[in-house]
């Protein structure tokens, strides 16, 4: 375990509309606003998402199990923002449901909004963190400097 203490900086309230590409739009805001460390919450709907539902086996590095989510899904999730060099890295876990059928997963790509998706981004000030590639684990891991 490792941790640092910081404070909440700027707060952004964002609305994505029907058909918007959510992850692409979020990356655009992060880059434009220069949000280097942050946390965000997501509430609304997605109609498309490519997600990882966990590892095939609990080993390091894990082999991800991919799933395509299609159709209207009520969505609630939370994620973090840290950078790997000049590239922001988003880590988002969300529950996506439809008529009682719910899937919880790591949302990775291909996200298209259904109706509306509301996002609140909290910038974290006062810490020096990044998300470089962690070869042993096979993923980008939060690291403090």
What are these regions (language model features)?
Residues 6, 68, 84, 132-140:
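Acidic/polar residues at beta-strand termini and the immediately following turn/coil
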Residues 105-145:
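Flexible glycine-rich active-site/ligand-binding loops centered on an Asp-His dyad
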Residues 1-14:
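Generic N-terminal amphipathic, Lys/Arg-enriched alpha-helix
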Residues 17-74:
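Short, well-structured hydrophobic secondary-structure segments
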Residues 64-108:
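Mid-chain, well-packed structural core segment of small domains
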Residues 18, 44, 96-98, 121-125:
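Short, structured patches in soluble enzyme cores that scaffold and shape functional sites
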Residues 27-35, 96-99, 109-112:
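Short, intrinsically disordered, mixed-charge
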Residues 11, 37, 89-93, 104, ...:
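Broad gene-expression machinery/nucleic-acid interaction feature
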């Amino acid at each position: 375990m490792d941790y640092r203490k910081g404070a909440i900086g700027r707060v952004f309230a964002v609305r994505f509309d029907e058909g918007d590409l959510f992850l692409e739009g979020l990356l655009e805001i992060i880059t434009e606003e220069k949000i280097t460390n942050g946390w965000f919450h997501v509430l609304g709907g997605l109609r498309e998402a490519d997600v990882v539902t966990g590892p095939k086996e609990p080993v390091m590095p894990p082999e991800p199990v991919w799933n395509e989510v299609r159709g209207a899904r009520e969505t609630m999730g939370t994620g973090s923002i840290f950078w790997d060099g000049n590239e922001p890295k988003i880590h988002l876990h969300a529950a996506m449901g439809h008529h009682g059928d719910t899937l919880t997963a790591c949302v990775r790509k291909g996200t298209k909004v259904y109706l509306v998706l509301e996002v609140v981004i909290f910038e974290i000030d006062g810490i020096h963190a990044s998300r470089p590639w962690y070869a042993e684990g096979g993923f980008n891991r939060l690291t403090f400097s």
